[in-house]
Amino acid sequence: MTLETDLRAASAATVRGAIERGDPLPGTAGFAGLVDGALVRDVLGRELVYVDREAADGGASAGARAGANGSASVWSFDPGDLADPELLPAGNVRPLRGDPAGEDRGEPGARQVWTLPDPAPETDEGAAVAAVRAAVRESVDEVGSTGLAVAFSGGVDSTAVAARVDAPLYVAGFEGSHDLTAARSAAAAIDGDLRETEVTHADIERAVEAVVAATGRTNAMDVGIAVPLYLVAERVAADGYDRLALGQGADELFGGYAKVARAPEDPRVEADTVRAARRETALGLPDQFERDLRAIRAAGVEPVAPLLHDRVVRAALALPGELLVAGEGRKVAFRRAVRAWVPESAAARDKKALQYGSLVARELDRLARQDGFKRRLNDHVRKYVEALTDA
């Protein structure tokens, strides 16, 4: 028997069907947890579940979820509950020793059940864009507005979400940052209720400690992304909202990165086509989710990512290369699709990565140098973060 509290973001029946059919995109926004004696995590890792290496291998009861009873904890949604946590890889099923319901799934140990589809490209460009439009519209509309706020940078991704929900918009950045300026402009264009957090050095120092504790990561890129996410989520929670909608995933799915546009010349990708480079970046999403979900949840709110619903993923994967990148334009199909409700000024706007658009990366560098960690040192921001947090 699978309890409702044992599985996040999907029904047990849906996950059972996905396992039986080998269906990687069964119509969910991701899932993770325990089903029929086995831990599961969706193909893109949009939810998190952890197993305790020693307890699971030692034969503790598979039902011993952290906090559930007095026995050894085998698994949890929170790695802090476990003595030796290991994140279940995306697309994997891991039967747990000692649970009769999992005996027919083989010996304990994770096995990959789902892989990201690689369909042939849609040859009808109009149909491809229409499919993206319908998928995004439905996925955003079904989010609902109860307890909802939107993380808003003023770019096409967050505006595609914000323009279709009745919820306040939140942005964090240093005064003069790209994100504050763009958010003000886009919020005015959609008549949105924008709430700004002007970040200070004290905010960074406080948030760094929180995100390192939550994520265990200290490198400059991960901290630079997690800090503004945490600060937005913290403000959202303080204002009484418990869900935070993000435009996460559009860059990875729709060809938003320069390295994808420059494939195969860009050394940051191994792929030899734009479509293959897009797939390569999409396969990196699970690692990002662990960072982002843990940082946002540490602030007390639940992240919602409608642009990563299975129906959007399926529509994106069917796009031909020319609807990902065309000349200097990126996310071609996505921009065309959401122009139905996104103002042109936002639909056409180039996006800066969160750590740069908020100026958090610049100010982390400044704080590190002020604290004696000079750029000539290898990885000076990481060293500063580790000194600040005793990591």
Would you name each region that the model predicts?
Residues 1-195:
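Cysteine-centered catalytic environments shared across enzyme families
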Residues 86-90, 374-382:
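Short glycine/proline-enriched turn or capping motifs at secondary-structure junctions
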Residues 125-327, 331-341, 359, 363-367, ...:
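ATP-dependent adenylate-handling active sites, centered on carboxylate activation for C-N bond formation
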Residues 341-353:
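Short, surface-exposed acidic
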Residues 352-360:
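Small/polar glycine-rich anion-binding or flexible loop at a beta-alpha turn
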